[in-house]
Regions:
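Short, surface-exposed basic-aromatic patches at helix termini and helix-loop junctions that form
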Residues: 308-310, 444-455, 473-483, 506
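Active-site-proximal segments of metal-dependent phosphoesterases and phosphodiesterases across multiple
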Residues: 391-411, 415-462
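Core catalytic region of metal-dependent phosphoesterases/phosphodiesterases
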Residues: 246-340
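Active-site neighborhood of phospho(di)ester-bond hydrolases with catalytic His/Asp-centered motifs
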Residues: 207-209, 275-282, 312-322, 428-432, ...
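N-terminal signal peptide
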Residues: 2, 16-39
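Metal-dependent phosphoesterase/phosphodiesterase active-site architecture
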Residues: 28-143, 150-270, 275-278, 340-419, ...
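Active-site environment of divalent metal-dependent phosphoester hydrolases
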Residues: 215, 285-288, 318-329, 393-395, ...
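Bacterial N-terminal signal peptides that target proteins for export
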Residues: 2-10
């Protein structure tokens, strides 16, 4: 996760839209009633672009939350501004003619170059980022954004229906409904998981996420550089009177140095018994405006080497984060071939995770190459499934082409879980982006799968948010019976929280094991203290059962924890401090904040707050 990707990529999309409008060829619409020749002169085109850009930024954000209606009036008010001298309304007919011109415009290389130049200028004029970032980010995303626009099957009618509403044309909804299919096999009755007998074998599972390693991190450098990522060797010294980047890390929009990464792994290796590792994505840094594929692959291989060094012979089960690709969030479906294909990343994962490290069996290769996901039988009766959650990523522009179960991943998940149920196996599911933050329709289908196979799925493990969280799946609104839990482990990179990692204790490898999560221990590094003393000291932050007064980590117990937080501010405040890993700089959380955070726990499905 990155502030840049969620906050500014919407602006980038808007910039490309406004550039297309600003550079369009003459369109045939004198006004909305009489067809004729209508031409925007150069000055008007430029003015229109600058006026539309902030609107389009807002509209992009609103569209993501499915509340764009107020912005339609704003657009018309902008277009009708007398200072533009256009004298017409951009209403339905005019919009359709304009979109036809857009289709023509993006087909030539010359137009692409012009789009890039003007988009960069608009970015600078609106001060979305500094000049260097504007120039680089537009070029970084140029091919993806324009290729998606070229391949997109939206007609001018659909575009204008989306912009102007259904009175103009039927809007396009890339979040439109689709459903996975389930085999005609009755769902088994769910029975409470019995606690293991005293002395039963257990396993220890390390969960690390969101490493965000920055090979350009430089202690003492400018930590307030004005760019999305600072503390880098090219940022120069800090301003007079301002502290430079800390030796072990910094909370001011900075990522993880190689020294901190090595220190983290060394500490874990020395102090923890680890049977296997869940690594839930986001290995590269947040410099998303100037990353290359070779940059990403270098980090991928480096992390594999580090884990093999510090944990020899220990299996690692990785999943792909949204930052693994270049550009960030770019995960085209299998049918996209050529330069824009994601084959380069999936082949590298096979090379690193199967051939080099032997973490995964060769049987994982087929689905890894298809869509970056796999399953593996870890022990008899226990299977791990690793999903590529970018198939539901709202910032993955390729989903504008086709968002219906990309690469057939969720239908594949149904088949894996059904086979596991039949074989009486238990399953842990790994992913990067929690389902509650993905496309609503993808998240809905995932929820249907969880509800159907709740007795088979004994744990879900995600990252992305950088925070220590959990989420609950309930059977239905009426009963409110918790049936499954999503664990979000937090990040190693400092981002309004101290670096940290988690170790789960799970029911172990023996006949009739439940393979359930029995407890988890959470460790953190007080970054402020580490920078002051130059002696990083990792500490136990909390143990779940003790901290939340739980008898087990079954879904029903997590449900009880949530109900306690609703009526007991002290209980919530404790959770909130863990949310930030005891970071001293966390903001206070008032009653509205508490309500929203508790609702977030109860919202395991994207856009569905019915359990709040």
């Amino acid at each position: 996760m990155a502030t840049f990707s969620t906050k500014r990529l919407a602006a980038l999309a808007a910039l490309f839209f406004c550039v297309v409008i600003a550079t369009c060829k003459p369109v045939t619409s004198a006004d909305v009633k009489t067809k004729g020749e209508y031409v925007l002169d150069e000055q008007t085109r430029s003015t229109l672009a600058y006026k539309l850009a902030p609107f389009l930024v807002s509209y992009s954000r609103a569209a993501a939350t499915r509340t764009p209606a107020p912005y339609v009036k704003m657009m018309n008010d902008i277009i009708r501004d007398p200072s533009l001298g256009i004298g017409v309304d951009i209403e339905c007919d005019a919009c359709k003619e304009l979109m036809k011109a857009v289709d023509d415009l993006i087909q030539t290389d010359e137009s692409r170059d012009l789009i890039v130049e003007i988009a960069a200028e608009v970015c600078k004029t609106l001060e979305i980022e500094d000049d260097r970032v504007c120039d680089l980010v537009v070029r970084e995303f140029k091919d993806e954004v324009i290729d998606v626009a070229t391949l997109h099957y939206l007609s001018p009618d659909q575009v204008c229906g989306t912009l102007l509403g259904p009175s103009c044309a039927i809007p396009y909804d890339y979040n439109s409904d689709w459903n996975v299919t389930f085999p005609n096999i009755p769902k088994p009755h769910m029975t409470p998981v019995q606690p293991p007998q005293p002395g039963s074998p257990t396993l220890r599972v390390l969960h690390i996420s969101d490493l965000h390693i920055d090979l350009m991190y430089e202690p003492g450098s400018n930590a307030e550089c004005g760019e999305p990522l600072c503390c880098r060797s090219n940022d120069g010294p800090p301003a007079p009177g301002t502290k430079g980047a800390g030796k072990w890390g910094d909370f001011r929009t900075c990522d993880v140095s190689l020294d901190l990464m090595k220190n983290t792994l060394e500490n874990i290796a020395k102090t923890q018994k680890v049977d296997f590792i869940y690594m839930t994505g986001d290995l590269p840094a947040h410099n998303v405006w100037n990353q290359t594929r070779s940059d990403q692959l270098k980090i991928l291989d480096m992390v594999t080497d580090l884990l093999m060094k510090y944990f020899p012979g220990v299996k690692v089960y990785p999943t792909l984060g949204n930052h693994e690709s270049a550009p960030v969030n770019s995960f085209p479906p299998e049918f996209i071939t050529g330069d824009q294909s994601e084959k380069w990343l999936y082949e590298a994962c096979v090379s690193s995770w199967i051939e080099k490290s032997d973490w995964l069996p060769k049987s994982a290769k087929e689905t890894m190459l298809r869509g970056g996901y796999y399953d593996v039988l870890v022990y008899p009766g226990f299977r791990v499934v690793s999903l590529n959650a970018n198939a539901g990523n709202t910032q993955n522009w390729w989903l504008r082409i086709n968002a219906t179960d990309p690469d057939a991943q969720l239908q594949w998940l149904v088949s894996v879980l059904q086979a596991a149920e039949t074989a009486k196996e238990k399953v842990h599911i790994l992913g990067h982006i929690p389902p509650s933050q993905n496309l609503a329709v993808w998240s809905k289908n995932y929820e249907l799968i969880v509800k159907r196979y709740a007795s088979t799925i004994t744990g879900q493990f995600f990252g992305h948010t950088h925070k220590d969280q959990f989420k609950i799946y309930y059977d239905n609104v009426t009963n409110r019976q918790p049936i499954n839990v999503v664990y979000v482990a937090g990040a190693i990179t400092p981002d309004t929280q101290n670096p940290g990692y988690r170790v789960y204790t799970i029911d172990g490898n023996y006949t009739k094991s439940s393979w359930a999560v029995l407890d988890h221990d959470n460790y953190y590094l007080n970054l402020t203290e580490a920078n002051l003393t130059d002696k990083p000291k990792w500490r136990l932050e909390y143990t779940a059962k003790k901290a939340f007064n739980m008898t087990s980590l079954q879904p029903s117990e997590w449900g009880r924890v949530v109900e306690e937080m609703k009526k007991n501010e002290t209980a919530f405040d404790q959770y909130y401090s863990y949310f930030h890993r005891l970071w001293e700089g966390r903001s206070p959380c008032d009653s509205s904040c508490r309500q929203n955070m508790i609702c977030d726990i109860e919202t395991a499905r994207s856009g569905d707050s019915s359990f709040c």
